[in-house]
């Protein structure tokens, strides 16, 4: 099997990465779009259906972040929390990265993988998220994010049916070009695409 690599260099038009990332927190529309798009991208990787945005769930998320206390709100929905990430994409990616600890041979709930399993739970159909700049007050450093999911997931005895192994995306072994690495040097971003030659 032979592999090829293609490097693409993209300019960021003089904007720094941090400046561009802040929009996902400061703009309501950008926040909603990023939360929904990143969530649905990862769900696609794990063969779960796309979620739709639900304003009632977003309002529940607002209640969860309002106090800047980093603890689950105890509402009737599934809930993922994150704080201190530079943008919403990084927060949701951290939830997805818990897959490294998930044991598909023993599919069950664990504190180490609960965010991941909520993110990709097969029976979930809707999401709503909220964020608040806590500025170090309370127990949430920086931006505090809550995403609420419905129907509620992480149901004991249902993990094998609702948390599938990765079928698409980087590392899936699907045999198609995938984004392998993204590097940032100054105002330039290098994108390496690794694929398989037949």
State where each predicted segment sits.
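Short, well-ordered surface patches within globular domains
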Residues: 21-78
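Acidic, polar low-complexity intrinsically disordered regions
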Residues: 70-74, 86-99
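Acyl-group handling in specialized metabolite and lipid biosynthesis
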Residues: 81
